[in-house]
Amino acid sequence: MPYRQTENVVRRLAARHDAILAAACDAAEEGGMAAVQIAAVAGRAGIAAGTVYRYFPSKIELVAALVVALCARELATLEHAAKAAPGPLSALAAALATFAARALAGRRLAFALTAEPVEPEIDAARAPYRQALAAEFEKLIRNALAAGHLPDQDAALAAPALLGALIEGLIGPLAPAAGDDPAKVRARVQMLTLFALRALGVVDARARGLVVQTVVPEPR
């Protein structure tokens, strides 16, 4: 008769899996993808390296699982912000502001997930995160287009272009430091949200009104 894991065993294995991913996330937040090493993650999780290998046979698989988990978390946050907005254009503005605010609040992790120079294998493992973000922005752009709030454009081209501009402006090597001053962080978020809306063809007065009305999320 084949062995069947009890519910307690299943829960314990799932909890350890989540603890490993949480430790990997902490490592990435502090030191980028270079810090996501099996031994270091094991130490943070309080387990042996061999235990991590039982869940994730290589660093590539660990990074891929981390990307999946963080992607789900960030997309859920963007979707929640968009759904709470009163209309398609407001939903787009809310998602843009939420992305900007969270990227600035977790700048090291955001850089690690999107732009940090890494080995080709690691870059391939984290590519789904950028793809998912671009797809979410594309959906919101299409909704605004369908409602007649944006001039005609190729949403599939505009979305990744917009994402690239936001990443570089928020967390790229050329981005100026926002510091910890809440007022300066809020101003940075609003400025880049305004930039993005203008780039999509929203007239200045309307774009400014949307930015003023959009709730900037508190630091996570």
Regions found by a protein language model. Give the residues of each.
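Short amphipathic alpha-helical elements of helix-turn-helix/winged-helix folds
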Residues: A23-A27, R102, A165
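Helix-turn-helix
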Residues: A19, A27-E61, A65
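Generic hydrophobic, amphipathic alpha-helix propensity
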Residues: L13-C25, V41, L66-L70, E74, ...
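Amphipathic alpha-helical packing segments from all-alpha helical-bundle domains
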Residues: A69-L75, E121-A147, A156-I171, A187, ...
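Short linear capping/connector segments at secondary-structure termini
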Residues: H80, A112-P120, V212-V215
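Hydrophobic alpha-helical connector segments
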Residues: A65, A76-G106, A159-L162, R186-V189
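C-terminal peripheral helix-coil segments that are non-catalytic and often amphipathic
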Residues: M1-R4, A135, K139-A146, I171-R220
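Short, hydrophobic secondary-structure boundary micro-motifs
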Residues: Q37, A110-T114, Q153, A205-L210
